[in-house]
UniProtKB/Swiss-Prot annotation:
Cofactor(s) of this protein: Mg(2+)
Gene Ontology cellular-component annotations: cytoplasm
Subcellular location as annotated: Cytoplasm
Name under which the protein is recorded: Mini-ribonuclease 3
Species of provenance: Synechococcus sp. (strain PCC 6716)
Pfam families, A to Z: Ribonuclease_3
Record PANTHER family: MINI-RIBONUCLEASE 3
């Protein structure tokens, strides 16, 4: 499978003031949209049926995947980023019953971090997404080689 090369996928405008006014839950809500658009972007090629796109995207936007990706990001995060992650994690409500609460909270913290970075530091967001993309591509390549 060929995926699109890394490139800025959104017109990002920094707005630190807006980010400071948002609750951790609101940052997570926004970060969820940022992350899903990023995942959709990297799986856009080669052309496939919509159902195939959907299955690929869902596999990567699930709470379990997001929690795993946060584990990958953790050592690369600044103290301020980890604070945003913790605030998002701690603000998480109980998620769906199919997902353990710890995983759901970690995924919510991950989303809050992405939402915060989108609003405050677009270049850092691109760096974080590039790191995630490397891991996602490696996972996809490993799965295809089976």
């Amino acid at each position: 499978m060929v995926m699109m090369a890394s490139a800025p996928f959104l017109p990002i405008v920094s707005d630190a003031i807006a980010a400071q006014r948002l609750s951790p839950s609101a940052l997570a809500y926004f970060g969820d949209a940022v992350y899903e658009l990023f995942i959709r972007f990297i799986f856009l090629t080669p052309p496939q049926r919509i159902n195939a796109y959907h299955h690929q995207v869902v596999a990567h936007v699930r709470a379990e995947s997001q929690a795993r990706y946060m584990d990958i990001l953790w050592p690369h995060c600044t103290a301020a980023e980890l604070t945003i992650f913790r605030q998002g994690r701690n603000a998480a409500a109980d998620g769906p019953k199919r997902v353990p609460a710890k995983i759901y909270r970690q995924a919510t913290g991950f989303e809050a971090l992405l939402g915060y970075l989108y609003l405050t530091d677009p270049q850092r967001l691109q760096d974080v997404l590039a790191l995630l993309e490397q891991h996602i591509r490696a996972e996809v390549a490993a799965a295809e080689s089976l």
